[in-house]
C-alpha cells in the first residue's frame, strides 16, 4: 500500500516538474527500489548518523563523548577493540574486516 502511494506521488511530481511528460517509470522504479532496500546506507554520513543516535563513536563504537578516563578513542584514529559488541558494530555499519587492520 505504501509503495502504491509513493509511486503515485512520484508520478505527480514528475508530471508537474519535468519537461517531458512520459517515460519516467524507470526513474520511479529505481527510486522505489532504493527506498525499499532493507540494507542501511553505507556512506560515512549514514554511519555517523546511526552512531550518534546511540551515543557511540562511528569508528570504534565506544561511548561518545567519552569519560574522563577514556584514552583509546579520539574519534580520528581509533579502531574497534577485541571485545567490541558485534551487535553495535553491525547496527552502526562498521565492517568487521576493519578490526584486523
UniProtKB/Swiss-Prot annotation:
Keywords, alphabetical: DNA-binding, Host-virus interaction, Inhibition of host innate immune response by virus, Metal-binding, Suppressor of RNA silencing, Viral immunoevasion, Zinc, Zinc-finger
Zinc finger boundaries on the chain: C4-type: 57-78
Region ranges (Basic): 47-50
Transmembrane spans: none
A Pfam family matched in the record: Carla_C4
Highest rank taxon of the organism: Viruses
Family assignment from sequence similarity: Belongs to the carlaviruses nucleic acid-binding protein family.
Biological role: Suppressor of viral-induced RNA silencing. The potential mechanism of action is based on sequestering siRNAs.
UniProt protein name: RNA silencing suppressor
UniProt organism field: Carnation latent virus (CLV)
